[in-house]
Amino acid sequence: MTGHEDRVWSVAWSPNGFVLASCGGDKTIRIWGKEGDKWICKTILEDGHQRTIRSLGWSPCGTFLASASFDATTCIWDQKSGEFECNATLEGHENEVKSVDWSVSGSLLATCGRDKSVWIWEVQEDDEYECASVIHSHTQDVKKVVWHPTKEILASCSYDDTIKLYKEDEDDWSCCDTLEGHESTVWSISFDGSGDRIVSCSDDKTVRIWKSYPPGNQEGVVVSGKHTKWKCVCVLSGYHDRTIYDVHWSKVSGLIATASGDDCIRIFKEDTNSDRNQPSFQLVATQRKAHSMDVNSICWHPKDENILATCSDDGTVKLWRFTPAEE
C-alpha cells in the first residue's frame, strides 16, 4: 500500500480491525479500509502536525485516534461526525513525542518522548485532557509506552537500556519496577493477552520475555514489598542480524512478531509444553526482504490471528497473511 511520501513510522489497527492507520515523515496519517478484496486509502489526515508523526494509538472504543509527533505535540482525532477531526492538541513535552497509548478503560492516555519523560493524561468530559502526572524515571530518550491489557499499569522502554513499570499509588503515579538485562536501547515492548508477560526487543539484537511474580507467588520467587516483581525468563538471540525496532505479541494467537533493521519480519511461537517460568520459543517464519529498507513497525490484527501489518523506511505499508505449518 503506497501513498506516503516519506518513511512510514507506525501502523495501528482499529480495535475492530476494520481500519488500519499509518503515519510517517510526510506529517500525514493515512486511514486504510477494505473495498472488496483491496485495501485502499480512505482518508488522509493533514494539518495536525508540523513535523514527522512517529506513533499512533486508537482508543478502546475506536472513536478516537491519538498521534504523537516530533513537533512535541500529541493530537487527538475523533470521527464522531463521520469524518476525522483534530479536537485536542496535548502540549507539554519539550521536544519529540515518540509514542502514545490508551489505557484499557479509555480514561487514561500515556505519552513519552526524547525529553526522558512519561506523561499520563486523564480524559475529561467534553474532550478535555488533563495532565495527571509527569514521570522522570528514565535517564534517556523514552521510545515507547504501552498499557497493561486489563489493569491501569503502564510500561515504558528507553535508550537507557531499561524497561520501567508504573502504577498509581495514593493519587500519584510512580515507577514500581525497573527491568534490566538488555545491553542497548530497548526499542519496543508488548504485553501478552493476560498481561502477566512482556516481550521486549532491542538494539542488542535480542528479544526478551519477562514474567510477573506478585507477592506470595506460587513459584516461590522472593518479592520484597507490595509491588509485583518482573523477571527475565527467556532470551531469544542469534535470530536477527540488526536492530529489532518493533515487537508485537498477538492477543489472539499468542504468536510474537518482530520487525528489524535487516529488512525482515519474523514470527516466534511458544512451544506447546513450555514452562511459563522458563519458556521456550521457536522461530516459525522469516520473511526476508519484507521491505526494501528498515521495518519500523509491526502489528497483529486484533481479530484475525493470521493477518499482520508492517511499515518501513521504504515508504510502504504492507499486509501479510501468515499460514501456520500443520502440527
Curated annotation (Swiss-Prot):
Gene3D superfamilies with a match to the protein in the record: YVTN repeat-like/Quinoprotein amine dehydrogenase
UniProt keyword list: Repeat, WD repeat
WD repeats: from-to residues: 3-42, 48-87, 92-131, 137-176, 181-220, 239-278, 290-327
InterPro entries associated with the record: CIAO1/Cia1, G-protein_beta_WD-40_rep, WD40/YVTN_repeat-like_dom_sf, WD40_repeat_CS, WD40_repeat_dom_sf, WD40_rpt
Tree of life domain: Eukaryota
UniProt xrefs under CDD domains: WD40
Listed SUPFAM superfamilies: WD40 repeat-like (SSF50978)
GO biological process, any: iron-sulfur cluster assembly
Disulfide bonds: none
Transport found in the keyword field: no
A Pfam family recorded for this sequence: WD40
Gene Ontology CC entries for this record: cytosolic [4Fe-4S] assembly targeting complex
PANTHER family: CYTOSOLIC IRON-SULFUR PROTEIN ASSEMBLY PROTEIN CIAO1-RELATED, WD40 PROTEIN CIAO1
Protein family (similarity comment): Belongs to the WD repeat CIA1 family.
Role according to the record: Essential component of the cytosolic iron-sulfur (Fe/S) protein assembly machinery. Required for the maturation of extramitochondrial Fe/S proteins.
Protein name, entry field: Probable cytosolic iron-sulfur protein assembly protein CIAO1 homolog
Source organism (scientific name): Nematostella vectensis
